[in-house]
Swiss-Prot record:
InterPro entries for the chain: Arg_succ_lyase_C, Argininosuccinate_lyase, Fumarase/histidase_N, Fumarate_lyase_CS, Fumarate_lyase_fam, Fumarate_lyase_N, L-Aspartase-like
CDD domains hit by this protein: Argininosuccinate_lyase
Family matches, as PROSITE patterns: FUMARATE_LYASES (PS00163)
Organism name: Caulobacter vibrioides (strain ATCC 19089 / CIP 103742 / CB 15) (Caulobacter crescentus)
Domain of life the protein comes from: Bacteria
Keywords: Amino-acid biosynthesis, Arginine biosynthesis, Cytoplasm, Lyase
Statement: the UniProt record of this protein carries the keyword Transcription regulation: no
Pathway recorded for this protein: Amino-acid biosynthesis; L-arginine biosynthesis; L-arginine from L-ornithine and carbamoyl phosphate: step 3/3
Enzymatic reactions: 2-(N(omega)-L-arginino)succinate = fumarate + L-arginine
GO terms (BP aspect): arginine biosynthetic process via ornithine; L-arginine biosynthetic process
Name of the featured protein: Argininosuccinate lyase
EC numbers, comma separated: 4.3.2.1
Pfam families: ASL_C2, Lyase_1
Length: 455
């Protein structure tokens, strides 16, 4: 491919560090798509003869058959997927294969291949996120009224419903899907035709190849086209945020399955045992999802560091863009699929959840709110009175609802027996009727909205 300039073969170590076919073979479908679009454009523009173009297209179809059947002969001496396919095309149809590279460089070829792959990965990820959201919606709808403690600092804070808690993740994953859609929209420009860096002297039609490959338009600057990998960085950023959300949900699943919490139960399908402790049933799927964020965020860091000091245009450093991107999306796909399966698999222990919902004086804020509404007390004063009530109850070893009216009135004489109506977890949750709140009616409204969005 470039032997005319060289009189000796590269050293074995040079070949070893330079070859990329071991990982970029994953781009074969994208490479074929780009080559077909390029060949048809060259024919239409009269850059190559129609009979040559048709021979090339027929040869590419034969190459595709070999790739699909697993009989394609990948060879390290051809370095990468582009030259492997071109070399095989030459073996199948002869020297006409050499016309395919007219008005094209490997620089714009790999740019379009990789952009197509990342675009497809974004589309797949959106579908996987939506499947996870639907699994969460199913559980949330079944448990729109199931009480559980809401936490701050992992301490009981206020009663919420299990459905409301799960809907928080539906929102997070919805934003994640939006980030992938946004990244896709920005990357949907075709770099093919930029050639090495300066464009092509041939009368090519870049809009034709862009349209053929499903892009909105060609990239506007040939130098930027082959120099940039920000489309992959943006996709990896979205992947890292998604993995962070998955890790948080996984951590809660790990906590909730412990005997100390006892909020949910996982079946054998998503747990493993111990080689020494017969009683163990470990939430390994959740733990592994929790850990995957390290690999995914590491991939973003890797590619950022690769790109940070590169002058324009292409440098061989950019060959290192693919492995971290492939690994990140492989890990993310597995995590999303496993999480969706685990969410569908889990069974909440609503009795334990409801019992825990009232722990830690979780209705204290409801008492303070009652003092504000009923006695027209400034909230800071109500906060102080409620704190005194909590201190009294704690000293007696009882809950707020177990204090007698006399004990309440010893703290604040204006308190009446009506206060007891707000001191149950169910009443607390039901009262949170503000938009987006945990009241079952609000939770059902959130569920209905997302069902419509995901329909």
């Amino acid at each position: 491919m470039w032997g005319g300039r060289f009189s000796a073969k590269p050293a074995e170590l040079m070949q070893a560090i330079n070859v990329s076919i071991g990982f970029d073979k994953r781009l074969w479908a994208q490479d074929l798509a780009g080559s077909r679009a390029h060949a048809r454009m060259l024919m239409n523009q009269g850059v190559i003869a129609s009979h040559d173009g048709e021979e090339i297209l027929e040869g590419l179809a034969r190459v595709e058959d070999e790739l699909l059947s697993g009989t394609f002969p990948f060879r390290d001496e051809y370095e990468d997927i582009h030259m492997n396919i071109e070399a095989r095309l030459r073996e199948l149809i002869g020297p006409t294969a050499g016309r395919l590279h007219t008005a094209r460089s490997r620089n714009d070829q790999v740019a379009v291949d990789f952009r197509l792959w990342v675009r497809d990965a974004c589309d797949r990820t959106v579908g996987q996120l939506e499947a996870l959201q639907k699994a969460l919606l199913t559980q949330a709808e079944a448990h729109a009224e199931s009480l559980m403690p809401g936490f701050t600092h992992l301490q009981p804070a206020q009663p919420v419903t299990f459905g409301h808690h799960l809907m928080a993740y539906v929102e997070m994953f919805g934003r994640d899907a939006g980030r992938f859609r946004d990244a896709r929209a920005r990357m949907n420009e075709c770099p093919l035709g930029a050639a090495a860096l300066a464009g092509s002297p041939f009368p090519i039609d870049r809009q034709q190849t862009a349209s053929a490959l499903g892009f909105d338009r060609p990239t506007a600057n040939s130098l930027d086209s082959v120099s940039s990998r920000d489309f992959a960085l943006e996709a990896l950023s979205a992947a890292s945020i998604t993995a962070t959300h998955l890790s948080r949900l996984a951590e809660e699943i790990v906590l909730w399955t412990t005997p100390m919490f006892g909020f949910i139960k996982l079946t054998d399908a998503f747990t493993t045992g111990s080689s020494i402790m017969p009683q163990k049933k470990n939430p390994d799927a959740a733990e592994l999802i929790r850990a995957k964020v390290g690999r995914i965020l590491g991939s973003l860091t890797t590619l950022t560091v690769v790109m940070k000091g590169l002058p324009l245009a292409y440098s061989k450093d950019m060959q290192e863009d693919k492995v971290p991107t492939f690994e990140a999306f492989d890990a993310l796909e597995l995590s999303l699929l496993a999480m969706a399966g685990m969410i569908a698999d889990l069974t909440p222990n609503t009795e334990n959840m409801a019992k825990a919902a009232g722990a830690g004086f979780s209705t204290a804020t409801d008492l303070a709110d009652w003092l504000v509404r009923t006695l027209n007390m400034p909230f800071r004063d109500a906060h102080h009175v409620t704190g005194s009530a909590v201190k009294t109850a704690e000293g007696l070893g009882v809950d707020l609802a177990d204090l007698s009216l006399a004990q309440f009135q010893a703290i604040e004489p204006q308190i009446t027996k009506e206060v007891y109506a707000v001191l149950t977890p169910a009443a607390s949750a039901a009262s949170r009727m503000s938009y987006g709140g945990t009241a079952p009616a609000q939770v059902r409204a959130q569920i209905a909205r997302w069902k419509e969005l995901l329909a």
